[in-house]
Amino acid sequence: MPLCTLRQMLGEARKHKYGVGAFNVNNMEQIQGIMKAVVQLKSPVILQCSRGALKYSDMIYLKKLCEAALEKHPDIPICIHLDHGDTLESVKMAIDLGFSSVMIDASHHPFDENVRITKEVVAYAHARGVSVEAELGTLGGIEEDVQNTVQLTEPQDAKKFVELTGVDALAVAIGTSHGAYKFKSESDIRLAIDRVKTISDLTGIPLVMHGSSSVPKDVKDMINKYGGKMPDAVGVPIESIVHAIGEGVCKINVDSDSRMAMTGAIRKVFVEHPEKFDPRDYLGPGRDAITEMLIPKIKAFGSAGHAGDYKVVSLEEAKAWYK
């Protein structure tokens, strides 16, 4: 099975009203942990690489690890996605290396400049059958060393942006933020999910929810129990994510939850078995913790059982969509 494009994967999700998890990866164990979950549940999946991940692991290493997942699990639709590409050059590099989807994030620019940059990326990507996600509005928190304050996506701006750029998916700002500290407290959680359906109806394309880690209390407690310091971490309730999926969100970005699951498991090994020094003795439990974390999420997103619903279209075939 070839790599799946974001357009096809999210098009199916939008049609059948479920969400697909987009899980950030940095190394082999994360990819294996994610794949174990989606294989067990027969779910499509998006493996995405951020700028920080590419600096850490190198784009070629990560691409080859993701391709290994595709080779080992040919029955699972897999999209390899560049997360938060910030320049045309970085996006071109990912496309030329064989990524099936890219995000160009020019949301920190004024509207017209965001449109201009995004159109350049769309032209380059679509000529090669590659899907494009863009962002309008800004999320709070810190994403790869870039600090932002929240600016919610305006529905009419979203409609105009999609019409002008021709993007395949749009990341909308509805009050979530990057990182594990999304809100000051659980009582402070405020999300503008009411905007999602309006934007979905106006644009007619799949929407993306960034900053969607739930920061489960049991995982946070484990980290703190074994020497960590995350007392004030607060995430997005899974119920809010499910609500957003029902309104038009099709791609759900999750990063912090996987990191926390792996960190908690590794800390536990270090404290309970200080004699261990073989990386397999702690990376293995970390990998398993990711699987355990993601299984209930994937079920909640509704994508379980949908891996065999469609025949994946190759990038070469996908070029015809844009002619």
From Swiss-Prot:
SUPFAM superfamilies hit by this protein: Aldolase (SSF51569)
pH dependence statement: Optimum pH is 7.5.
Sample GO molecular function, one term: fructose-bisphosphate aldolase activity
Co-factor: note: Binds 1 Zn(2+) ion per subunit.
Keyword match Cell wall biogenesis/degradation: no
Alphabetical list of InterPro entries matching this protein: Aldolase_TIM, Class_II_FBP_aldolase, FBA_II, Fruc_bis_ald_class-2
Function description: Plays a key role in glycolysis by catalyzing the cleavage of fructose 1,6-bisphosphate into dihydroxyacetone phosphate and glyceraldehyde 3-phosphate. Does not cleave D-tagatose-1,6-bisphosphate.
Complex and partners: Homodimer.
Protein name (database record): Fructose-bisphosphate aldolase
Source organism of the structure: Giardia intestinalis (strain ATCC 50803 / WB clone C6) (Giardia lamblia)
